[in-house]
């Protein structure tokens, strides 16, 4: 992997790395810092890395480790995720989000233990196979399956509890929201403007 190949790889993977890191650390801003740190570490390690069989996995593992480093530093400092910090989190949708992961806000991900969070993000948000996750995290396939099962169950609980506390919309309001979303997705901005 030469520097030009690395630059192309980093550019292509950057959005996925950011999605993963932001959800791991609970902040879009800190996620960006983690991605930058990971890319710097990868660039530094590149000359000594030798032949890299799976460049995407290699870079994701470096980003994963950088996110874990930030979480450890945060824990040592005793920094807790405040409600203010969670309110500032940007939750970007992914083209491969699973149903539960898509409805879970970033604040719900923050409440998962680190291993469960990693497995759910890698599988449901980034689309990695169980074997790839086991390889990336250096754990057994059984451990991945268990963490994924527990993480999804916990996310379901968190999302359901959030839904219970949210006010219910009237059917007319739901219909307006659906119409708005349909027109937006169809890029029919004239019809969208008429709704406003």
Regions of interest found by a model, annotated:
Residues 2, 37-55, 73-75:
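Sigma70-family region 2
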Residues 50, 60-81, 157, 161:
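Arg/Lys-rich amphipathic alpha helix in sigma70-family domain 2
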Residues 119-120:
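A short pre-motif secondary-structure segment
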Residues 114, 126-143:
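Helix-turn-helix DNA-binding module
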Residues 141-143, 148-196:
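Solvent-exposed, charged amphipathic helical/linker segments at domain boundaries
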Residues 69, 77-99:
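Internal acidic/polar
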Residues 1-19, 29-32:
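A short, charge-rich alpha-helical start-of-domain segment used by transcription regulators
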Residues 19, 33-40, 53-65:
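Structural recognition of an alpha-helix C-terminal capping motif at a helix-to-coil junction
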């Amino acid at each position: 992997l030469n520097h030009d190949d690395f630059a192309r790889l980093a550019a292509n993977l950057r959005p996925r790395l950011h999605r993963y890191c932001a959800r791991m650390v609970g902040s879009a801003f800190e996620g960006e810092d983690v991605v930058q740190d990971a890319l710097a570490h990868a660039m530094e390690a590149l000359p000594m890395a030798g032949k890299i069989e799976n460049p995407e996995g290699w870079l994701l593992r470096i980003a994963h480790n950088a996110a874990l480093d930030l979480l450890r530093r945060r824990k040592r400092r005793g920094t807790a995720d405040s409600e203010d910090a969670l309110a500032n989190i940007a939750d970007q949708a992914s083209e491969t989000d699973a149903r539960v992961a898509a409805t879970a806000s970033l604040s719900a991900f923050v409440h998962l233990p680190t291993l469960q969070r990693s497995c759910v993000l890698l599988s449901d948000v980034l689309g990695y196979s169980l074997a790839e996750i086991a390889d990336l995290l250096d754990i057994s396939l059984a451990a991945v399956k268990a963490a994924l099962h527990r993480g999804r169950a916990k996310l379901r609980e968190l999302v359901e509890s959030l839904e219970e506390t949210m006010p219910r919309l009237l059917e007319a309001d739901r219909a307006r929201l659906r119409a708005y979303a349909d027109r937006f997705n169809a890029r029919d901005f004239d019809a969208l403007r008429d709704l406003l």
